[in-house]
Amino acid sequence: MTRKLFGTDGVRGRANSYPMTAEVALRLGAAAGRYFRPVGAGSPRVVIGKDTRLSGYMLENALTAGLTSTGMNVLLLGPVPTPAVGFLTRSMRADLGVMISASHNPHEDNGIKFFGPDGFKLSDEAEAEIEAILAGEIQPAQPGNIGRAKRIDDGRGRYQEYCKTTFPAGLRLDGLKVVIDCANGAAYRAAPEVLWELGAEVIPLGVEPDGKNINLRCGSTHPEAAAEAVRAHGADVGICLDGDADRVIILDEQGRQADGDQIMALFAARWAEEGRLRDATLVATVMSNLGLERFLSARGLRLERTPVGDRYVVEAMRRGGWNLGGEQSGHIVMTDFATTGDGLLAGLQFLAAMAQTGRKASELSRSFETVPQLLQNVRYAAGQEPLTAPSVQAVIREAEVRLNGSGRLLIRKSGTEPLIRVMAECEDEALLRDVVEEIVAAVKDAA
């Protein structure tokens, strides 16, 4: 079976346009309900969380209707981070978890992703089976077996308490001034409260969601305001989350950014010294910088690369039994603590390193020199396949010859947007620019 509706991170699109319509969400809920509750089975429960997008109300109600129509009992969590849904699915012994979010995308977009009873995102195979059910006639429950829906008030609080248990026992953040940018998203209450309860002086940004300002000039994809706040307040560190708080970017005391590669390098080195890094292996995607690979190799550590997408990082970690992975974009996966990327937990681990070592954020967030990397995105029209054009393939082959032995080239379609991502790494920056610009021009001509 193949997946057409699901991308690399669930179903995603523009709100009120296919597939992010109330009609599709209702049927998707019913299909998921029938997948997790075969005809004649008991009354499983599902938890539903969402971020702060205006369209979340519509999709939450539609999903609830579809799920209850097949006999699923629904527990509504309200706005919570994506990793909270994974945690609460397990903690509340639910059979299914659902998160309504388009992560770092603007408010006009939204998405739906599913978690299994173990708190991990569903496999490609499970999503394909749900699509197959969706394509057919979905049998509803008998009138006496229709599910119920109930709003849960303490879901966020349960997650916050769990977050604090991952912080080293007896350690506090007294004396640390922390800027936290919540992107007007799902962690707008949880993140500042956890930091304050651990003793930090908290300067919160992006904590006034209005349904339309999620990720708007704030958060991990737009950290400029947080960087300015770090400098203006003389803060020790900045933590920037995205709209659903599953990714993080760290800012040092000068407001300079540290991406997921630098964060993973710090954690891998510390965990290896402490004997916590399983099989001396870090899992990251093909997008991670060559400098990270060199840093790990110099310390006798191994980098296992996967396709782009935190779900593929997690799948590789589970297959190999490894416990640390992530993406350059800021998804940091620590399976000792969570089933998916968790920006708040990663931020807490960085703060713990600061508190335990007494070192500045700038000293901890620059583990290696990055190899110059250039990434450009090219938007294309629906139905087009520019990468199959002979002219594009010829330019790519020529670029590979020019980079041979001196760098890396990666060209791929986005799994969540109609974009071609062109990425190259090379010590020779002039060659790097030439190669990327030539490929981008060819893709634009073919798109």
Swiss-Prot record:
GO terms for biological process: carbohydrate metabolic process; peptidoglycan biosynthetic process; UDP-N-acetylglucosamine biosynthetic process. Keywords: Isomerase, Magnesium, Metal-binding, Phosphoprotein. The keyword Membrane does not apply. It catalyses: alpha-D-glucosamine 1-phosphate = D-glucosamine 6-phosphate. Pfam families: PGM_PMM_I, PGM_PMM_II, PGM_PMM_III, PGM_PMM_IV. Activated by phosphorylation. The modification Phosphoserine is found at S103. Mg(2+) binds at S103, D242, D244, D246. GO terms for molecular function: magnesium ion binding; phosphoglucosamine mutase activity; phosphomannomutase activity. Its cofactor is Mg(2+). One of its GO terms (cellular component) is cytosol. Its EC number is 5.4.2.10. It comes from the Bacteria. It is an enzyme of class 5 (isomerase). The active site is at S103 (phosphoserine intermediate). Belongs to the phosphohexose mutase family. Catalyzes the conversion of glucosamine-6-phosphate to glucosamine-1-phosphate. This is Phosphoglucosamine mutase.
